[in-house]
């Protein structure tokens, strides 16, 4: 495989959806290249036998995730692994000088204790003693943590729901324009958000022609959203978050409801707030008043489409966001973080125009 000095990227968990999307985005990237393919189940196999639909130069072999081998050929590592696995590999890579972007939830919480509570199922088989590493990891939302990401050794890429929900919400928390109580998030995602491992709820016969809520109380992403929201707002926040599974492969739509502190603010005023915050962020597009985002518009892109409306009758602010859950919600955001870490423009090599229809 061709490599670029200073931009060699190992992809661990290469055959999962996150890994596949990462590899696809790195193909043809002007400053980064794939240097190592890691995967336990497919170790020893040629890439063409694992993913014939995504050919790579020289048809490399998939290898076990040996830290020494990864460090010998890589500057960065993207870990696209189930929760509870990245925390075992990341410290070994960091010790060897490899900078890590983790797509799982293992380092998203500042507090290890909170992670152990939220991810109790995974934590039961682990003996994590890396509280200091958790607190030092940078939350990988580039539009909000860009400088910290650029200098980071370990970046924890946000979940897809937190990304879509926080992007429109944070500007209004930062400016103190909304009440911090009573925030409600209603989000809908496609089946690819469940990953590539077979699950009954994701079967065509189960998911097709049906929309269903899940994780209605205590979904894991609730506390992740609250953590970042509290950091920006500077005060305690408890919000309501309900995700829904919809019968499509990819895409995520989040609608956020909050009460304005100034009922005189208009949709035009609130749109200006978003435009001012995201003016210099090419991976965000703020739509004009009255135009509401559709998931198809963001499909196959690393762009977040944002829109806002004000209900003068109720005093409610309605924020809308559409992303591709596998790109801006996962792999694309990971590459966006590596771009910053490598000293590149954040949007380098990332698709910003959708395939439509």
Curated annotation (Swiss-Prot):
GO molecular function ontology, one term from the record: N-acetyl-gamma-glutamyl-phosphate reductase activity
Superkingdom per UniProt: Bacteria
Bilayer-crossing regions: none
Enzyme Commission number(s) of this protein: 1.2.1.38
Record: active site: 160
Bridged cysteine pairs (disulfide): none
One BP term from GO: L-arginine biosynthetic process
Pathway: Amino-acid biosynthesis; L-arginine biosynthesis; N(2)-acetyl-L-ornithine from L-glutamate: step 3/4
GO cellular component entries: cytoplasm
Keywords: Amino-acid biosynthesis, Arginine biosynthesis, Cytoplasm, NADP, Oxidoreductase
Reactions it catalyzes: N-acetyl-L-glutamate 5-semialdehyde + phosphate + NADP(+) = N-acetyl-L-glutamyl 5-phosphate + NADPH + H(+)
Pfam families: Semialdhyde_dh, Semialdhyde_dhC_1
Location in the cell: Cytoplasm
Family label: Belongs to the NAGSA dehydrogenase family. Type 1 subfamily.
Function: Catalyzes the NADPH-dependent reduction of N-acetyl-5-glutamyl phosphate to yield N-acetyl-L-glutamate 5-semialdehyde.
Stated name of the protein: N-acetyl-gamma-glutamyl-phosphate reductase
Gene that encodes the chain: argC
